[in-house]
Amino acid sequence: MFSIQQPLLVFSDLDGTLLDSHSYDWQPAAPWLTRLREANVPVILCSSKTSAEMLYLQKTLGLQGLPLIAENGAVIQLAEQWQEIDGFPRIISGISHGEISQVLNTLREKEHFKFTTFDDVDDATITEWTGLSRSQAALTQLHEASVTLIWRDSDERMAQFTARLNELGLQFMQGARFWHVLDASAGKDQAANWIIATYQQLSGKRPTTLGLGDGPNDAPLLEVMDYAVIVKGLNREGVHLHDEDPARVWRTQREGPEGWREGLDHFFSAR
């Protein structure tokens, strides 16, 4: 058993989890966000989004100043009070966005893979794809250690593309809407473990952890959590964990922020 009164960290995916996949609404989760904030429980956002996007969302959600995990773990934005840590304000893992872009351009030109990256289009096009405002769409292009793309080729070619990326030290990861290319060594799980270790070092006690996610790219994060909420999502593959002990893992009946609230209700309301 655990409660929000003990040292606790909550790690949360965004699109399809804390945010509605289509409207980006988060209001159903607002009461729990307020309760966690009042209990001094950090809610650490963890997403494929850029750090620029996530810093904007932190302010919207009342989570400013906390650490966050961007670009599927390739970027860690440090907490405001962690200024003494090397790399402040951000730690970037592995290959840079520019280097990945060069690799992708070479593969497209020489091996004729079909895809469109966010670097190929303007913010107006991204607005059409996502429903975001123009100003928010511009933030989606500020990648530091990954590339986001739409795949426009066959499944067979995707397998070949993935293999080529792996040979070059990169990974190809599916998100809620788009695909992402990043360093093979990066991941939400590694980033979360680093943040957990930092909190433990600063407080002298390892915090209990709860993670929430809805897609296959959230599985590594949820695997390293003490407790996990798998929010019902739109992805046909779903989320599958090695340890799905019902005492540790809760699968919601609701989607998006309604499911996020359901997961928190399950683990805490009776405690």
Curated annotation (Swiss-Prot):
Biological-process GO terms, alphabetical: mannosylglycerate biosynthetic process
A Pfam family annotated for this UniProt entry: Hydrolase_3
Its EC number(s): 3.1.3.70
Active site residues per record: D13 (nucleophile)
Protein name, per record: Mannosyl-3-phosphoglycerate phosphatase
The species this protein was found in: Shigella dysenteriae serotype 1 (strain Sd197)
Alphabetical keyword list: Cytoplasm, Hydrolase, Magnesium, Metal-binding
Reactions this protein catalyses: 2-O-(alpha-D-mannosyl)-3-phosphoglycerate + H2O = (2R)-2-O-(alpha-D-mannosyl)-glycerate + phosphate
Organism superkingdom: Bacteria
Cofactor needs: Mg(2+)
Top-rank EC class of the record's enzyme: hydrolase
